Regions:
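Extended hydrophobic/aromatic segments used for targeting, binding, or gating
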Residues: 210, 223, 237-239, 255-256
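Transmembrane alpha-helix entry/boundary detector in multi-pass membrane proteins
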Residues: 215-227
């Protein structure tokens, strides 16, 4: 507190939550937390979080995932060659020939380095996604478990509307999630285009719009549920890719992909439609139409229609993607192994001399 008091006032929105307010008299969630209102200055903190994400992404990519993948893949190639040729003379060594020089038989070729480089880049990109979604989903589960709502019957998300005062964890959850999707949109436009660039960008635009609208229209409880459902399966797809890029036995990426497929189906095609149904029917039944920004009411026929149409649009896109996922599952069943058909796996079928392109899940 003393530190923040010494900073210029225009800096504070970039490093702290804006618009603190009184805790409700009888809070139904986070009774011991500081509460806040929504504020346009929240975008300042979102900008800071985007910058932090960019730094963390590169730090993990360059400092952890790339070195590990490069070491592991290089070691595997050398060990394979040792096992292939070492028995012929009984004294071959992957580490050297006794005079401080590497054994030429086991040195990496130019083609080896290109292949490793391609896998290392892809492994590192997926690593950031695994770290983010694992931590964010865990935080989202903590937030949602403290809200008086139920996944299978989210009717309570509408009771007590408008939920103007937000507990600090809820506000942090929303702003960090919004910052991540904005960061992903920047990455999508900065890197080589994938096959599904238009679909992914459309998905992110609709998602960001829904986050922003539910945040400022005081519909954060249903928003927390939707974000929690969306994030779970996104842990397992990049993890399956990482296991494949490390050339581990196919059973490991296949099992992980199967977990991804199961969680996708349950969260996005069973539980998410329940949230959509509640938005269409329960929201209209429990919240009267009223546009009164001073009291936090932003519910009109137009806004209600806009919300559920955007949610339905997300579900349609997810159904298209799930059809692609089923195709991949069929390849697993027929023994071809799991590959991601939702994105452009550049270089997978290219000659090793082809361009190496970064790819973000």
């Amino acid at each position: 507190m003393v530190f923040s008091q010494r900073l210029p006032e225009y800096i504070l929105p970039f490093i702290s939550l804006s618009s603190p307010t009184n805790t409700p008299a009888n809070p139904d969630s986070f009774p011991n937390s500081q509460h806040y209102r929504t504020d346009p200055k929240d975008l300042c903190l979102v900008i800071t979080i985007i910058a932090v994400y960019a730094i963390l992404r590169d730090a993990l990519r360059l400092g952890v995932f790339e070195p590990f993948a490069r070491w592991k893949l290089s070691r595997d190639i050398k060990l394979q060659r040792k096992q292939h040729t070492g028995t012929s003379n009984g004294n071959a060594s992957v580490f050297g020939n006794g005079n401080g020089n590497s054994n030429p038989k086991f040195m990496l070729t130019k083609a080896d380095r290109r292949k490793i480089h391609r896998s290392v880049l892809r492994f590192a990109e997926q690593g950031w996604s695994v770290v983010y979604y694992t931590l964010q989903w865990g935080f989202g589960l903590y937030v949602y478990s403290n809200l008086p709502t139920r996944v299978l019957d989210p009717v309570d998300a509408w009771i007590g509307y408008p939920h103007v005062a937000l507990a600090a964890p809820v506000k942090i959850y929303y702003l960090t999630e919004l910052a991540f999707y904005l960061h992903q949109m920047l990455i999508l436009n900065a890197e080589a285009r994938r096959k599904d660039h238009v679909q992914m960008m459309t998905h992110h635009i609709v998602t960001v719009f829904l986050m922003w609208a539910s945040y400022y229209y005081n519909l954060t409880r249903i928003g927390c549920l939707v974000m929690l459902l969306m994030d779970l399966c996104d842990i397992f797809l990049p993890l399956a890719k990482m296991l494949r890029y490390l050339n581990l036995p196919q059973i490991y990426p296949d099992l992980t992909f199967g977990t991804f497929m199961l969680t996708w189906f349950v969260t996005r095609h069973v539980l998410f439609p329940i949230a959509i149904k509640s938005t269409i029917f329960d929201m209209r039944r429990l919240i009267p139409f009223d546009w009164d920004p001073e009291r936090g009411y932003y519910h009109t026929l137009g806004s209600h229609t806009m919300f559920y149409l955007c949610l339905l649009a997300l579900e349609v896109m997810q159904m298209i993607w799930f059809a692609m996922i089923v195709r991949v599952a069929w390849k697993v069943v027929t023994g071809e192994g799991a590959t991601d058909v939702r994105s452009d796996e550049e270089g997978e079928d290219e000659d090793d001399s082809g361009d190496i392109k970064n790819k973000q899940e």
